[in-house]
Every structure is written in structure tokens, then in C-alpha cells.
Regions:
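Iron-sulfur (Fe-S) cluster-binding modules
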Residues: 1-65, 76, 80-88, 107, ...
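Short glycine-rich anion-binding loops that position phosphate/pyrophosphate groups of nucleotides
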Residues: 69-71, 95-97, 170
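Extracytoplasmic/secreted cell-surface and envelope-processing proteins
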Residues: 74-75, 99
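Short gly/pro/ser/thr-enriched loop/turn and capping motifs at secondary-structure boundaries
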Residues: 95-102, 120-123
């Protein structure tokens, strides 16, 4: 008798959908997935209902790949529900792992976000002063929408996470790695980062590295780069020195700097702080005014340093309220 199929769920919280597409990017391996697993819940692809999840027994699902951050009360509710129903919970992709790009919203308050989105937005009709509310009574019923939290949180802030699969989105090889590990019963220790390396991206990058001293910082489109030389040495801010390896150096090999989506390298406590330190250390000047001018060329320090990990940073660790 054939082994029973794995019972699998996939879900997106505050996310863009790229992680779901990454599952399909496994190409013909998706046919193997269909042979060994039943996908019981996947909102981006199947019209499942929360009631279907609620009706399942606790632990009925073998595996959940949860992508996306926790931005509102619905995200948290479904995360907690899937945690109860799943034997293995995986934070899948940068947003679930670290908070991701949605986490950059933590640089503004909820009130500032609402003001910009609903009151001071150039696309709004003049005179529109509508703000969202969580409850609205209409003729026949009361409508409810999720509560928008004050902060974006990573998945591990609200539920216990067994494994982490980094990337924006994860590479197809990582998707295969986590599925095969479950199928073969070869899961690593709880808390492991699956399908990624144990070094920095710089360690795997083959670009030539010389002395890192720069007089100005540039964005990729502002210069004609040397395709063989370290991007950071050319004044193009690259996060490879502080980022976990495992992506195959896809961005630098394509002429684009590493953005840091695989999260902090092993032994890096705060990826953004380490990135700021690395950039500051290569400024070729001792004159305070010149240093200020050079650093001032970086258009968005927060975005460069904490593009994917602000909710997981030490800057956020004192913030507990949802």
C-alpha cells in the first residue's frame, strides 16, 4: 500500500505573491509535489475558506509554508490557526522570516500611514476624508475588517516557527529542499534555516576584491561598472558582506548589488547595523564635511540597511504592542 500523501497548506500574510509563484517556479518538480502531497489550502490558487481550516483536526496538516509578514489581525488569526493545524510550520520567504519589505512601514506610525494613504494622497478625490474603521453597521448587518496593527511583525513574533526559508522570493532549490526534507523524514534541528548557506554571499561571489575605499556612492544606473570588480569597491552599495549565502549570487552575477533578502549571515546579530558599519568603514576621507557629503549621496539609508529585516532588528526589539 502506498504511503499516505503529505497534507500541505500554503498561505500569504502581508505579501506580494512572489513566494507563491516561487513554488510554481520549481518547474517539473511540481509534478513530484502532486504525487507525494495534497495541497489542502492555498488561497492564491484555490478558493478555500477559513471554515475549511477551522474544521480540520489539530495537527492534521503535515506542513504549512507561510509567506508574508503579520500586518493585521487577520494575518495573526490565520497564522495561529495554521500553527494549531500543522505539524511543521515554515516561515517561507523574507517577509515571514524577517518582516520583509512591508516591515519598512515600521519607520512610520499607523497614523502617518493612514494619513498618507487616505487623506494626503494625490490620487484621492478632493474632499475625501474617509478613514478605515474595523466595524461598520449597514442596513442588514455589521461589516468587519481586520485591525491594522501599529507595527509589522515577522511570523515568529506571533507563533512558534519550526523552520525558516529565506529569500525574496526563495529560490526553487530551497522549495525543493524543504519539501524533500519533509517527505524523506530528514528535517534538520528545529529553528534551522533551510536551503541556504552558512557563509556570506561575499564568500561565494567571484568578483575581484581589492581595497575598499570610495569617494562617492552611486546607484547601478549612474555608472558603467566593471563587471569583474566588487560592486562595493565601485561605490555601489551591496549587502553581500552581511547577508547569508545560498542564492547562487544571482544579483551580483547579473550586475545588480545584493539587497540582503536572505537575511543576516551566521553570527551577524543585526544585518542593518552591520551594513551601515561596512559602508561607513570604506569612506575614503577624514574630513567631517566631506564624509557628510559622501554619505549624503545615499538616498535611503533605512531602505538600504533594513530593506528586508527592520521588524527583526534591534531597533524593533523593544516594540511589543500589536
Amino acid at each position: 500500500m502506498a504511503d499516505p500523501k503529505l497534507q500541505v497548506a500554503l498561505y500569504w500574510g502581508a505579501a506580494c505573491g512572489g513566494c507563491d509563484v516561487a513554488v510554481l517556479d520549481t518547474d517539473e518538480f511540481i509534478l513530484t509535489v502532486a504525487e507525494v502531497a495534497d495541497i489542502r489550502f492555498w488561497p492564491i490558487a484555490v478558493d478555500g475558506k477559513y471554515a475549511d481550516l477551522e474544521a480540520m483536526d489539530d495537527g492534521e496538516l503535515d506542513l504549512t509554508l507561510f509567506n508574508g509578514a503579520i500586518r493585521n489581525s487577520e494575518n495573526q488569526y490565520v497564522a495561529e490557526l495554521l500553527r494549531r493545524k500543522s505539524k511543521v510550520m515554515v516561515a517561507f520567504g523574507s517577509c515571514a522570516h524577517l518582516g520583509g519589505i512591508p516591515g519598512l512601514a515600521n519607520d512610520a506610525s499607523r497614523e502617518e500611514i493612514f494619513h498618507r494613504a487616505y487623506l494626503d494622497n494625490p490620487s484621492l478625490e478632493e474632499g475625501n476624508v474617509t478613514l478605515p474603521v474595523t466595524e461598520k453597521k449597514v442596513a442588514s448587518c455589521t461589516l468587519e475588517i481586520p485591525r491594522f496593527y501599529r507595527r509589522v511583525h515577522k511570523l515568529a513574533d506571533v507563533v512558534a516557527v519550526d523552520y525558516f526559508v529565506p529569500g525574496c522570493p526563495p529560490a526553487p532549490t530551497q522549495v525543493k529542499a524543504v519539501l524533500l526534507a519533509v517527505v524523506q523524514g530528514a528535517l534538520p534541528p528545529i529553528g534551522s534555516v533551510v536551503g541556504a548557506g552558512e557563509r556570506t554571499l561575499c564568500d561565494e561571489c567571484e568578483r575581484r576584491k581589492e581595497e575598499k575605499k570610495v569617494k562617492r556612492f552611486q546607484r547601478p544606473w549612474q555608472t558603467i561598472q566593471d563587471p569583474d570588480r566588487c560592486l562595493l569597491e565601485q561605490g555601489i552599495i551591496c549587502a553581500g558582506s552581511v547577508t547569508r549565502s545560498g542564492c547562487g549570487v544571482r544579483c551580483p552575477d547579473s550586475g545588480m548589488p545584493c539587497r540582503g533578502c536572505y537575511g543576516p549571515a551566521p553570527n551577524v546579530h543585526d544585518q542593518g547595523a552591520k551594513m551601515i558599519s561596512a559602508v561607513a568603514s570604506i569612506v575614503d576621507s577624514r574630513d567631517p564635511d566631506e564624509i557628510a557629503t559622501i554619505i549624503g549621496e545615499i538616498p535611503d539609508v533605512m531602505g538600504f540597511a533594513y530593506r528586508f529585516g527592520l521588524p527583526a532588528s534591534t531597533l524593533q526589539q523593544s516594540v511589543r504592542s500589536l
